[in-house]
C-alpha cells in the first residue's frame, strides 16, 4: 500500500473516530423556532399563530399599562424529529425560563410540572418519545397568581410565556447529570482562597442509566485559555444507582484572582467523563477565584482590599419585548452600566438570565442574586402565607438559584427577601429556614435581605440592606444620611447597605424651579430626580460603614398598575428610559463620579428649553478637573468641580429669545456640550 493510501486511510480513521467521539458526547440543540401559540380558550384545530422563542403574550396589554393584562394559560406546541440513532441515549428538554407554572406534555403524555417563573428547569423525555419519527411537544404555561408560588406580589409585570431559550439535550446513558435542579452538574466549591493558594473541591453529579456498577474515569483540567494549569484524574466505581456524586479535591498555587472590574480573570474548569478510555461527556464551567469579607464598620473588601460597591438594580424587561430578551439586549444593558461606571448590581427581584450572570462574571461586576420572595411594600397585599406548599416552593426556588448559579464568581450575595412585613402570617421562622438552607447549600457566600422597616427581620441574614426613598415617598434626601447614622449607632454590629434608593423622572417633564413633586401624580420633573441622586450619593459615599448601595433603578421598567409620570404602566425611576435610548441627567452625575476613565462633560437640564425666568442656574457634571460656562459667546467664568464631579453657576442672566449655552472642559477644549434655550 503506497504512502498516499496510508495517509488517506489514516485520515478516514481519524474522522470516523472523531465522529464516534462526538456522537458519544452530549448534544444541545436550540429549539426556539416555529412554535404554535394559542390561549387556552382557543380550541379549534386552526387556532394559534406561529411564534419564535423567547416569547411573552403580554407585549401589547401589559406594556400599554392595562391593569387587567392577560394572566392565564398559554399553550406552546411544536413537532420535533427524534433521530433513530438517539435510541439508547438520554433525552431532555431544558427550559431557561417560563412564567410562572409550566406543564410539559410529550405525545399527549404529561411529563412534569415546574412551579416558578424565573429559574431554569428540565425534564427527561427518554422513555416518552418515538425514535425515527416526529414527536409532539406541548407546553402549557400559566402566569395567573398562585397562592403557593413565589412571588405573590410585585411592583412589576408578571409576564406570561416561555420567555427564555429552550434546548433539546441528548446525552450518553451515563453522563454528568443535567437534572440536579437544572444545574451544570458540577459545583466548584472554593473552600479557601488567597494570593498564595486556592483550595477547592469539585462536586460532580452523575447519572447511571445502565443501573450497573461500572469502572469510570473523571478528568478535570483547569485552564488559563488553552494552557493547562492543573489536571486531576479520578478512577472510580460508579454505583448501580441512577444518581451519585464524586468529588475531586485540588488546589492551585499562586492563583490569578478574579478581581472585580480591575481584573475579572477566570480560569476554565473542564470536566470530562470517560468509559473505558472513551470520552462520553464534557462540562465546562467558569472558575473565578476570589475571597471577600464585609465589615460592619468599614464595608466590603474584595481580595483583601476595600471596594466601595457602586451599584444599581436591574429589572429584565424593556420596551416592545417585555421580558422576552435576546443576548444583544443583555449586552446592551451591560454596556450602558459599564459606561456609567457601575461595579456592583442587584438583579432584582428574581433570578435573571444566565446570559446576564455570564456578563457580570466577564466584566467583574459584584452581584447580588435573589429569589422572588417579595413583600407588599407600600401596597395592600400579602407577600407571605403560612402554607406548607408556599414554603416548599420558596425553598425550591432558593435551591434552583444557588445550584444553577453556584459557579458564577461575580455572585457574592444570596438575597432571601424584599420588603416583608411581620403582620398577619409572620415570616420570621420561615426566613430562618431559608437562611439555614442557603448556608447548607453554599457555606461560602453570605445571605442578604432588603428591608423597608424596623424589626426582627433585619437580624436574620448575614447582611442587611434598606430600601430608602427619602425625598421621594416621604421626607427629604438629607434624611437618608440621618437614617444610616441612627441605624449604625443603634446597631453597630449590623452590616448595613442600601438596597434601593431612587426617584421618578420623565424626560418630558421639565421645570425652572427645583421643587419636590407628588410621586403618585402625573408630574415627575427630571431635575428633582437629579437633585435627589446628588444628595443621596453624598450621604452614602461619606459613610464607610455602608457596605454597598444600589440605585433603584438602572432602567425604567413596566408596572401595569402604576398611574403616574408621563404615562400609565411605567415605573420611571430609571436612570435610563425604558427603551434604552435616553440617559437622564442623573446617569451623567453617576458617570462623572464613578467612571474616571472615559472623559466627558455634560450640561444638565438641557431638555428644559422653554424658560420662564431671566436668571438661571447651570449645573455641569464632568470627570475632568473643571469647566467654563459660555453664554451667547461670552464667558461666564471657569469653575473647578467639587468632590462630587459637579460645577454650578448661579444667577446667570439670559436675554429674551434664544440663548446659546456652551460648557467646555478646562482640561480639554475638545470636550464640550451645548444647547439653545429660549425665554
Positions of PLM-derived features:
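Secreted/periplasmic carbohydrate-active enzymes, especially glycoside hydrolases
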Residues: 1-15, 22-349, 359, 363-367, ...
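Long, contiguous interaction/targeting segments characteristic
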Residues: 98-173, 517-590, 595
Amino acid at each position: 500500500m503506497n504512502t498516499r493510501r496510508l495517509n488517506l486511510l489514516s485520515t478516514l480513521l481519524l474522522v470516523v473516530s472523531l465522529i464516534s467521539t462526538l456522537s458519544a458526547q452530549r448534544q444541545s440543540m436550540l429549539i426556539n423556532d416555529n412554535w404554535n401559540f394559542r390561549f387556552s380558550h382557543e380550541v379549534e384545530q386552526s387556532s394559534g399563530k406561529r411564534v419564535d422563542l423567547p416569547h411573552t403574550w403580554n407585549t401589547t396589554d401589559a406594556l400599554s399599562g392595562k391593569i387587567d393584562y392577560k394572566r392565564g394559560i398559554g399553550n406552546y406546541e411544536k413537532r420535533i424529529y427524534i433521530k433513530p440513532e438517539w435510541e439508547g441515549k438520554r433525552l431532555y428538554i431544558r427550559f431557561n425560563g417560563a412564567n410562572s407554572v409550566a406543564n410539559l406534555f410529550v405525545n399527549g403524555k404529561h411529563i412534569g410540572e415546574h412551579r416558578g417563573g424565573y429559574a431554569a428547569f428540565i425534564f427527561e423525555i427518554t422513555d416518552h418519545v418515538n425514535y425515527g419519527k416526529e414527536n409532539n411537544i406541548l407546553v402549557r404555561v400559566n402566569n395567573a397568581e398562585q397562592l403557593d408560588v413565589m412571588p405573590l406580589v410585585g411592583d412589576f409585570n408578571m409576564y406570561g410565556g416561555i420567555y427564555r431559550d429552550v434546548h433539546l439535550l441528548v446525552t450518553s446513558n451515563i453522563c454528568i447529570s443535567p437534572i440536579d435542579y437544572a444545574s451544570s452538574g458540577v459545583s466548584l466549591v472554593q473552600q479557601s482562597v488567597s494570593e498564595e493558594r486556592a483550595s477547592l473541591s469539585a462536586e460532580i453529579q452523575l447519572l447511571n442509566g445502565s443501573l450497573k456498577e461500572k469502572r469510570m474515569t473523571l478528568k478535570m483540567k483547569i485552564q488559563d485559555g488553552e494552557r493547562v494549569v492543573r489536571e486531576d484524574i479520578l478512577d472510580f466505581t460508579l454505583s448501580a444507582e441512577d444518581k451519585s456524586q464524586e468529588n475531586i479535591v485540588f488546589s492551585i498555587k499562586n492563583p490569578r484572582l478574579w478581581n472585580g472590574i480591575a481584573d475579572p480573570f477566570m480560569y476554565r474548569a473542564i470536566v470530562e467523563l470517560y468509559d473505558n478510555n472513551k470520552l462520553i461527556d464534557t462540562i465546562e464551567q467558569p472558575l473565578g477565584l476570589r475571597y471577600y469579607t464585609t465589615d460592619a464598620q468599614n464595608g466590603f473588601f474584595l481580595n483583601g482590599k476595600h471596594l466601595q460597591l457602586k451599584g444599581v438594580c436591574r429589572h429584565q424587561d424593556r420596551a416592545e419585548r417585555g421580558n422576552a430578551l435576546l443576548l444583544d439586549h443583555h449586552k446592551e444593558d451591560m454596556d450602558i452600566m459599564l459606561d456609567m461606571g457601575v461595579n456592583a448590581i442587584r438583579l432584582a427581584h428574581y433570578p435573571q438570565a444566565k446570559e446576564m450572570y455570564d456578563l457580570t462574571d466577564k466584566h467583574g461586576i459584584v452581584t447580588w442574586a435573589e429569589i422572588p420572595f417579595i413583600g407588599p411594600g407600600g401596597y395592600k397585599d400579602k407577600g407571605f402565607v403560612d402554607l406548607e406548599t408556599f414554603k416548599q416552593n420558596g425553598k425550591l426556588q432558593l435551591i434552583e438559584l444557588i445550584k444553577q448559579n453556584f459557579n458564577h464568581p461575580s455572585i457574592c450575595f444570596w438575597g432571601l427577601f424584599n420588603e416583608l412585613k411581620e403582620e398577619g402570617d409572620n415570616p420570621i421562622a420561615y426566613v430562618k429556614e431559608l437562611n439555614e438552607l442557603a448556608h447548607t447549600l453554599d457555606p461560602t457566600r453570605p445571605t442578604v435581605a432588603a428591608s423597608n422597616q424596623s424589626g426582627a427581620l433585619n437580624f436574620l441574614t448575614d447582611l442587611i440592606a434598606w430600601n430608602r426613598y427619602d425625598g421621594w415617598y416621604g421626607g427629604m434626601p438629607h434624611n437618608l444620611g440621618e437614617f444610616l447614622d441612627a441605624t449604625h449607632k443603634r446597631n453597630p454590629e449590623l452590616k448595613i447597605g442600601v438596597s434601593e434608593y431612587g426617584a421618578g423622572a420623565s424626560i418630558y417633564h421639565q421645570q425652572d424651579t427645583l421643587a419636590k413633586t407628588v410621586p403618585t401624580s402625573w408630574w415627575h420633573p427630571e431635575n428633582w430626580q437629579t437633585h435627589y441622586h446628588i444628595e443621596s450619593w453624598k450621604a452614602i459615599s461619606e459613610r464607610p460603614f455602608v457596605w454597598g448601595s444600589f440605585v433603584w433603578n438602572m432602567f425604567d421598567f413596566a408596572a401595569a398598575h402604576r398611574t403616574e409620570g408621563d404615562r400609565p404602566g411605567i415605573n420611571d425611576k430609571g436612570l435610563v428610559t425604558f427603551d434604552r435610548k435616553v440617559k437622564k441627567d442623573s446617569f451623567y452625575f453617576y458617570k462623572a463620579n464613578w467612571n474616571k476613565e472615559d472623559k466627558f462633560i455634560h450640561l444638565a437640564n438641557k431638555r428644559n428649553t422653554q424658560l420662564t425666568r431671566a436668571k438661571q442656574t447651570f449645573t455641569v457634571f464632568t470627570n475632568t478637573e473643571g469647566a467654563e460656562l459660555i453664554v451667547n459667546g461670552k464667558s461666564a467664568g471657569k469653575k473647578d468641580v467639587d468632590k462630587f464631579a459637579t460645577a454650578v453657576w448661579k444667577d446667570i442672566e439670559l436675554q429674551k429669545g434664544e440663548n446659546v449655552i456652551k460648557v467646555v472642559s478646562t482640561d480639554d477644549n475638545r470636550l464640550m456640550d451645548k444647547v439653545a434655550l429660549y425665554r
